[in-house]
Regions:
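Conserved beta-strand-loop-beta-strand element in the redox core of flavoprotein oxidoreductases
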Residues: 1-16
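Conserved flavin/dinucleotide-binding core of flavoenzymes
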Residues: 5-7, 24, 33, 54, ...
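Solvent-exposed residues in well-ordered beta-strands and their adjoining turns
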Residues: 11, 61-63, 102
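Short, flexible loop/turn elements at secondary-structure junctions
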Residues: 12, 20-26, 64, 143
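Flavin (primarily FAD) binding-site architecture
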Residues: 19-42, 59
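Central beta-strand plus flanking loop segment that forms part of the substrate or channel wall
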Residues: 42-69
Length: 202
């Protein structure tokens, strides 16, 4: 008999059918799928055990690159945490200073109003540059901790989880194969996600 095809039914009513598929979405999204038949218990446990890092990027658009050095970066002990030049080696007098925070620092920056967040960021820069508010044109935010599809930025393997959990997550389920940055040796980067997709195909 011919092997059963994989049927994907979407929330908008669309249906797709294939001989085999590669599932490369984060484990949070995998948990939202109604699998029929259901996934093996061992795989479900592995999916639930994998955690994801909470990352926030808070770019500041500036009318002038007041930090001067194209290679500028800076670490602080404030919630704003880490800064780097987001428009490095790009032409123009304006620039983007990227504020990058993880964990509780990212949570705190993402949870406050835009004006308050700007104040926190500007205060973190003040010891090095003084008052830079006149240079600020706009500020933006993306917080992966509340991303509706991943609820995290990249997979965060706890102690021993790399060897305990990853092999189970990689195991195919019927005609569904799994890939993604969380299953890559170069884990946490899009290059790793791409390589894991190539590995799944082979």
């Amino acid at each position: 008999t011919a092997p059963k095809k994989v049927v994907i039914k979407c929330s908008n009513g669309s249906t797709f059918e294939a001989d085999k598929i590669i599932c490369s979405i984060p484990t949070f999204a995998i948990k939202q799928i109604q699998w029929n038949p259901i996934l093996p218990t061992q795989k479900i446990d592995a999916i639930h055990s994998l955690q994801y890092a909470r990352i926030g990027k808070f770019p500041i658009v500036c009318t002038e690159r007041f930090w001067k050095d194209e290679n500028f970066d800076m670490v602080t002990d404030t919630p704003a945490h880490y800064f780097y030049h987001g428009t490095k080696n790009q032409p123009g007098s304006q620039g983007v200073l990227m504020c990058y925070a993880i964990g509780e620092k990212a949570d705190s920056l993402a949870s406050v109003h835009k004006n308050q967040r700007e104040e926190i960021i500007l205060n973190a820069l003040k010891p090095a540059f003084g008052n830079v508010k006149p240079f600020i044109k706009n500020s933006l935010m993306y917080y992966w901790g509340t991303d509706p599809f991943s609820y995290g930025a990249y997979a965060f393997y706890g102690k021993d989880k790399w060897f305990e959990v990853m092999p189970t997550l990689k195991q195919a389920f019927m005609n569904t194969h799994f890939a993604g940055e969380h299953l890559a040796d170069w884990q946490g980067f899009m290059e790793g996600a791409l390589q894991s997709g190539l590995d799944a195909v082979s």
